[in-house]
Amino acid sequence: MQNDQDYGNKLNPAWDEKGLITAVLTDAKTGLLLMVAHMNKESFELSMATKEATFWSRSRKKIWRKGEESGHVMKIQEIRIDCDQDTLWLKVIPMGPACHTGAQSCFYRLVEDGHLVTIPKDKI
């Protein structure tokens, strides 16, 4: 049986018990997976209004706009939501590296045989 949450046109994010939703960011031009973060209602609304990715920092317990210190903002081109409305997909144009380490993507290491292997920058 179809329901509005899965099939309807009403935006109704399924916030978790902490009031958060997972956001996956990819490069709008290349499709590269850049990072995963979390949004609360306020950061989601700010992201939609400003077209710049803004999140809830679970460690610092505050709103943060990606790149507010480094200048490496993420310009939102498109926001999608999954069928359960519990995960967001932001297609962005990155204004610099996505990772705080300076890597283009936060996913710059492979897990092999229980160890981490750094992927060369030209292979990320």
Swiss-Prot record:
Entry GO MF terms: magnesium ion binding; phosphoribosyl-AMP cyclohydrolase activity; zinc ion binding
Broad class of where this protein is predominantly found: cytoplasm
InterPro entries reported in the protein's UniProt record: PRA-CH, PRib_AMP_CycHydrolase_dom, PRib_AMP_CycHydrolase_sf
Gene Ontology cellular-component annotations: cytoplasm
Subcellular location: Cytoplasm
Record-level GO BP terms: L-histidine biosynthetic process
Stretches of the chain forming a coiled coil according to its record: none
UniProt: Zn(2+) binding residues: C83, C99, C106
One Pfam family hit: PRA-CH
Cofactor note: Binds 1 Mg(2+) ion per subunit.
Known pathway: Amino-acid biosynthesis; L-histidine biosynthesis; L-histidine from 5-phospho-alpha-D-ribose 1-diphosphate: step 3/9
Cofactor(s) it depends on: Mg(2+); Zn(2+)
Binding site for Mg(2+): D82, D84, D86
Keyword annotations of the record: Amino-acid biosynthesis, Cytoplasm, Histidine biosynthesis, Hydrolase, Magnesium, Metal-binding, Zinc
Recorded catalytic activity of this chain's protein: 1-(5-phospho-beta-D-ribosyl)-5'-AMP + H2O = 1-(5-phospho-beta-D-ribosyl)-5-[(5-phospho-beta-D-ribosylamino)methylideneamino]imidazole-4-carboxamide
Subunit field text: Homodimer.
Function of the protein: Catalyzes the hydrolysis of the adenine ring of phosphoribosyl-AMP.
NCBIfam families: PRK00051.1 (NF000768)
Protein name: Phosphoribosyl-AMP cyclohydrolase
Gene (name only): hisI
